[in-house]
Structures are given as structure tokens and as C-alpha cells.
């Protein structure tokens, strides 16, 4: 019965543990995570880790018009650039490169030492990110909608790139 504490449709692991899918996050799950993650962090990292997500938002404007954005976050000393988008009419003018540089600078202020990102596997994306000091670390076949993506890393986060186009 729902709410009775009995597993519903669960897959037994052993005599006293069963796994099941539940709908939505429950306070009991949040409490479990709050109690168990610090222990797991100490085992793995030797200390507790601050997993607070700190958003990073950078925008480019031409007058009052939004010309581009870089969106991401810093978590546990690592930045992840989730989105970089420049208006079609503003591409090729250095806007994207400047957004990435400002994103990395802000991420460093928030304690990040490196930045990861994923992008489509195209020659243009490769040239753009490699020119900004990112290094290819993984290929992700058929990642989104059957298209290949790439995973890039920039470390150190703040560096001379030789250009920001």
C-alpha cells in the first residue's frame, strides 16, 4: 500500500532491501542525501565538499538588444559552461570569445580552477574552443538527437589565449 513503507513493485536486492521507483523527491530522500554525502565525500576526497551550485550568467548587448549569452555554474571548484549562444547577426565578431573569457573570469572568482563544456562535433566548434585554450577530452557519439558531441576542458581557467574571436 502507498505510504505504508512497504516497497511497491520493488526489485529485491537481498532479504531486507528492495529497490523501487518513486514519484518526485521526498523529504526522507533529502535527509538521506544530507546525511550520507558528507561521509562519501570524506571517503573519496578526504574532506567534505561544498556542492552548492553557483550560477554564472554573462550577457552581451548591442545597445538595448541582447546579442549573446553564456550560462553555466560553478560547483565544487569546477565550472561548467552549459550554454553559449550568440545572435545570428553577431556571430564572427568576437562576441562569443569575449563571453567565454568573462564566464571563465567570473567562474574563477567563484573558486573554479577549470571549466568543462559540451558542444556539437563540428569543425567550427573545434576551432572556436581550441583557440580559447580548451582541450578535447572526450567524444560523445550520438549524444543529442543522434548527433556527436565533444567534451572540452580548460585548465588553468585564466590564461592567455591569443585571441577571442
Placement of each model-derived feature along the sequence:
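A short, internal acetyl-CoA/4′-phosphopantetheine-binding micro-motif in the GNAT/acyltransferase core
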Residues: 84-91, 120
Amino acid at each position: 500500500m502507498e505510504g505504508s513503507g512497504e516497497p511497491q513493485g520493488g526489485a529485491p536486492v537481498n532479504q531486507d532491501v528492495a529497490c523501487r521507483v518513486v514519484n518526485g523527491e521526498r523529504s526522507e530522500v533529502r535527509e538521506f542525501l544530507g546525511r550520507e554525502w558528507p561521509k562519501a565525500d570524506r571517503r573519496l576526497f578526504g574532506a567534505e565538499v561544498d556542492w552548492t551550485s553557483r550560477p554564472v550568467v554573462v550577457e552581451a548587448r548591442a545597445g538595448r538588444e541582447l546579442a549573446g549569452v553564456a550560462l553555466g555554474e560553478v560547483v565544487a571548484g569546477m565550472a561548467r559552461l552549459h550554454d553559449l549562444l550568440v545572435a545570428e547577426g553577431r556571430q564572427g565578431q568576437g562576441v562569443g570569445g569575449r563571453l567565454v573569457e568573462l564566464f571563465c573570469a567570473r567562474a574563477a572568482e567563484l573558486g573554479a580552477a577549470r571549466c568543462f563544456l559540451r558542444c556539437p562535433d563540428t569543425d567550427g566548434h573545434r576551432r572556436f574552443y581550441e583557440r580559447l585554450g580548451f582541450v578535447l577530452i572526450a567524444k560523445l557519439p550520438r549524444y543529442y538527437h543522434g548527433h556527436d558531441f565533444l567534451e572540452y576542458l580548460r585548465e588553468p581557467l585564466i590564461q592567455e589565449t591569443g585571441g577571442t574571436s
